[in-house]
Amino acid sequence: MDDGVDKQAILDAALAEVIASGIDAFSLERVARRAGVDTTVITRNWGDRRVLLLDAQLSSSAQRVPIPDTGSLRGDLMALVQSMVALSQTAEGRRSMHRFLAASGDADLSDVRIDYWRVRLDELTTVLRRAEERGELRDDVDPAEAIRMFSGASLFDVVFADAPVRPEYITQMLDIFIRGISTTP
């Protein structure tokens, strides 16, 4: 980051702006105003709103839903689902998720959503690759496909039913998922 600019402050401002104003109203000018910097600073460092929004979403996810490394498949998946659910239970997390998932007439911002999930799912796949290295994952399980299934099942109620995720659902989903991919019953 050049110009002595606080990158995280701008990313935080970008995330706050998209949550407050929505994805369709998201602009570099609004983020610059919120961050207290000139628009040229943002343009010089990110180029356009698509890149800035993607970077802001990925930065937020990395902080709020870190990739766990507990040393066991069950421990990693439990830590992962707990942080995913915790974020989805906050008002900010729910607003951000719904706005980010909402259909937009803006092709660039639709691409952001696609790029976000491509990058984020690759990061989350680390959990299953580690399990594979420890011999905990069945040979016929594709870690990338399995983490997609896990993520979808983890947040099904939030995304499709607009309801909080129940603890008993998480426990049962995790048990079923692990039985399906693990080398041990």
List PLM regions with ranges.
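Hydrophobic alpha-helical segments that form the core
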Residues: 102, 138-160, 168-179
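Amphipathic alpha-helical packing segments from all-alpha helical-bundle domains
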Residues: 108-133, 144
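Amphipathic alpha-helical segments used for helix-helix packing
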Residues: 51, 56-57, 88-114
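C-terminal peripheral helix-coil segments that are non-catalytic and often amphipathic
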Residues: 79, 122-133, 160-185
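N-terminal intrinsically disordered/low-complexity leader segments
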Residues: 1-5, 185
